[in-house]
């Protein structure tokens, strides 16, 4: 009998997208779709397992930006409106398809799904989806881990990198150790603010930390140790190419020189699931993501859900069928049977793998991380697959589901290894986020980080409190009727928010892939523009409070952000 472990880790993340200045905003749909198709189905799946006393051990990150959106009143109100529009559309679809039994059955399914989703979100959890995650964490079934504040790519924020050479994407800083620079404080602030948001949200300290894009470079372990992190994840080669080489390959954690343990992804196990070509989601029976009534039906029939724009609705009537062929209608029952068969196959493959590794004389841990949005959004049957993986794993005696924290508690003695610079992006390094299409971002981010560090140090320990002049009040009035230090604190907090939002790795990714390139570019420019305007006003003692209030209204995340981390 093996004593090995399988650790499943889900990374739930979306960039902060909130546009109160618009009644409808297309990119807010990313959030609405993820709640409907991914987060609520995953919560309900985990609750079913807990209620049925099925042994469940799962690790999951909920990034700070996602937590901020889940607790935002405006976005929750807009999500309910979105559900109401889907319910209206599918009610009309039931009528339109009344003479087509298979399409009518699918329309019935979507109508009932959206109604039940609304009941769950509004009635059961009072528009607070963080509550069930907290409750699952408290049962011990779910280990929630922290992540960086706005998903900044930490190695690229850690210190300035050349963006005009021939080797874009190759980490020239791979052997560097910690240095106190403004860029280093930018990475530190991302980690420590992310830790703080976790503590505010879950009233606990995180044991694990999800590095955005699994991107690691030397010296990050020191910041993670400062944040009291016990473990973090890497891609396979980040540990395999470490120094010295890990004795147990990627199948045991290794402590870093600063202290936190690094665990590595089992790439083959991951690809078996997420690859659309060779992996499970490409099965012909599964729902076709790209065939959507939002593109098939007339705009006037789509009604206010579309508000005159072609976009995904979430109502999809067809299955994968095959590449470049006519798409057949979707059969939910058949798709679920395939998911159950694949779940059994996945568990059996992991059993064989763990038995084989255990025969070498130690208790392995096979770590399989995924983007959470794969399950339900990109792969509609994913939550059903995952539920049956957990059920089958619970019934086998050859290995057990575990979390990295539990494994480390049971196996505290491990090798010390300096991991290699790495990411889980294409080709394993930085080229997705640092290439000719997006390299222009980083000099501006580093300049802003330099400015943030300067003002943080300058305002951290003022000698006396002086009234702050600003353009909306006479010079003898203190801004907002508040003490000057309190007003300065507001400005410094907003500076931190704008810098953090500009640093999101999502923007560089979207620019590289060409998906929402214009929107991503605009977001970077807008946040840096607001940052620079507030910086200039603060350093010239002439803050426009109306502009500050506008920034606070639009970019309202992290109310307790600690700007002193930039010192």
Question: What is each stretch, according to the model?
Answer:
Residues 460-461, 471-475, 479-486:
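Short, low-complexity intrinsically disordered segments enriched in A/P/G/S/L with frequent Arg
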Residues 25-36, 107-124, 150-163, 173-186, ...:
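The substrate-binding groove and active-site-proximal loops of carbohydrate-active enzymes
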Residues 2-57, 62-105, 243-461, 485-567:
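Active-site and substrate-binding clefts of carbohydrate-active enzymes
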Residues 162-211, 349-369:
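CE4/NodB-like, metal-dependent polysaccharide N-deacetylase domain
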């Amino acid at each position: 009998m093996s004593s090995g472990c399988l650790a499943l880790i889900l990374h739930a993340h979306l960039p902060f997208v909130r546009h109160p200045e618009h009644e409808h905003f297309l990119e807010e749909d990313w959030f609405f779709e993820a709640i409907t198709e991914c987060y609520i189905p995953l919560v309900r799946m985990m609750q079913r397992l807990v209620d049925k006393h099925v042994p469940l051990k799962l690790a999951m990150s909920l990034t700070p930006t996602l937590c901020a959106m889940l607790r935002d009143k405006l976005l929750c109100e807009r999500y309910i409106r979105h559900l109401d529009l889907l319910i209206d559309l599918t009610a009309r679809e039931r009528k339109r398809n009344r003479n087509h039994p298979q399409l009518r059955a699918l329309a019935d399914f979507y109508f009932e799904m959206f109604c039940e989703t609304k009941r769950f979100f509004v009635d059961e959890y009072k528009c607070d989806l963080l509550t069930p995650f907290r409750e699952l964490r408290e049962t011990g079934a779910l280990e929630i881990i922290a992540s960086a504040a706005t998903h900044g790519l930490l190695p690229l924020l850690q210190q300035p990198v050349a963006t005009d050479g021939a080797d874009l994407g190759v980490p020239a800083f791979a052997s560097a150790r910690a240095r106190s620079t403004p860029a280093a404080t930018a990475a530190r602030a991302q980690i420590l603010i992310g830790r703080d948001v976790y503590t505010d949200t879950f009233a606990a300290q995180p044991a694990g930390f999800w590095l955005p894009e699994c991107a690691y470079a030397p010296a990050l372990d020191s910041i993670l140790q400062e944040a009291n992190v016990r473990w973090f994840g890497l891609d396979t080669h980040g540990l395999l190419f470490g120094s010295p080489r890990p004795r147990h390959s990627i199948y045991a954690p290794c402590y870093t020189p600063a202290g936190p343990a690094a665990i590595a992804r089992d790439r083959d196990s991951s690809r078996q699931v997420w690859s659309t070509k060779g992996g499970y989601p490409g099965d012909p029976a599964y729902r076709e993501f790209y065939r959507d009534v939002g593109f098939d039906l007339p705009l006037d029939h789509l009604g206010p859900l579309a508000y005159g724009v072609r976009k995904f609705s979430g109502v999809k009537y067809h299955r994968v069928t095959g590449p470049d062929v006519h798409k057949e209608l979707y059969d939910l029952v058949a798709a679920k049977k395939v998911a159950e068969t694949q779940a059994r196959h996945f568990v059996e493959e992991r059993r064989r793998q763990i038995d084989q590794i255990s025969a070498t004389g130690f208790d392995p841990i096979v770590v399989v991380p995924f983007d959470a949005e794969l399950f339900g959004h990109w792969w509609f049957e994913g939550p059903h697959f995952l539920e049956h993986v957990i059920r089958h794993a619970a019934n086998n005696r050859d290995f057990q589901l575990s979390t990295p924290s539990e494994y480390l508690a049971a196996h505290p003695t491990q090798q010390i290894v300096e991991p290699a610079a790495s990411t889980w992006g294409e080709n394993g390094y930085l080229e997705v986020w640092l290439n000719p299409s997006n390299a222009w971002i980083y000099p501006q981010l580093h300049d802003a980080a330099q400015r943030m560090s300067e003002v943080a140090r300058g305002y951290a320990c003022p000698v006396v409190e002086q009234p702050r002049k600003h353009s909306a009040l006479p010079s003898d009035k203190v801004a907002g009727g508040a003490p000057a230090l309190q007003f300065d604190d507001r400005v410094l907090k907003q500076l931190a928010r704008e810098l953090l939002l500009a640093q999101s790795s999502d923007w560089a990714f979207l620019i590289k892939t060409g998906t929402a390139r214009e929107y991503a570019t605009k977001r970077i420019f807008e946040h840096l523009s607001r940052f620079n305007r507030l910086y200039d006003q603060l350093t010239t003692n002439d803050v426009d409070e109306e502009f500050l209030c506008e920034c606070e209204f639009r970019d309202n995340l992290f109310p307790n952000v600690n700007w002193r981390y930039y010192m």
